[in-house]
């Protein structure tokens, strides 16, 4: 790269393109992985990453500001994403770690990890709240998008993830295994986002 600006352009465009061109088709969200050879031995090409989608959504805002796409294109994609998320599996308002893209149904991350994932959902919601702030004073489509995000945000039952009246949030809850993963959010790690 000739200079830092070229490097920054390259990094931002590449990040944006993963979410724009590489997105799962039904949802517009980030795929868990993309194999450039299009060979998926585990048949997981349609798996959506909830936390990774949060990072990708933030990248869409950068893409609008950098004129990689226009605002109308960005709002259309973000509306598609939010509409999909409103219909996808949620567990007390919280999405699972992974979703099966075409159906919006949970794709278990592990044996007992087939329900709500509070930390991954927090990565997603952090970016959705950035989108909300970005569009809340815009045109009617943008205001409608902000209102939909408010519904999703207010639907997240953080108090449920206290496992009763415990004074801590828990990472996972499963409709099949309840609180068996028993992972309280504590320490200096990715759970601080929650």
Question: PLM ranges: what are they?
Answer:
Residues 2, 6, 10-13, 47-54, ...:
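Soluble non-cytosolic domains of exported or imported proteins
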Residues 23-30, 57-60, 64, 182:
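Short amphipathic alpha-helical segments enriched in hydrophobics
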Residues 1-45, 92-94:
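Low-complexity, Ser/Thr/Pro/Gly-enriched N-terminal "stalk/linker" regions
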Residues 5-7, 93-122, 137-194:
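Extended ligand-binding clefts on enzyme/binding-domain cores
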Residues 27-32, 68-74, 138-145:
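Surface-exposed patches in mature extracellular/periplasmic domains of secreted proteins
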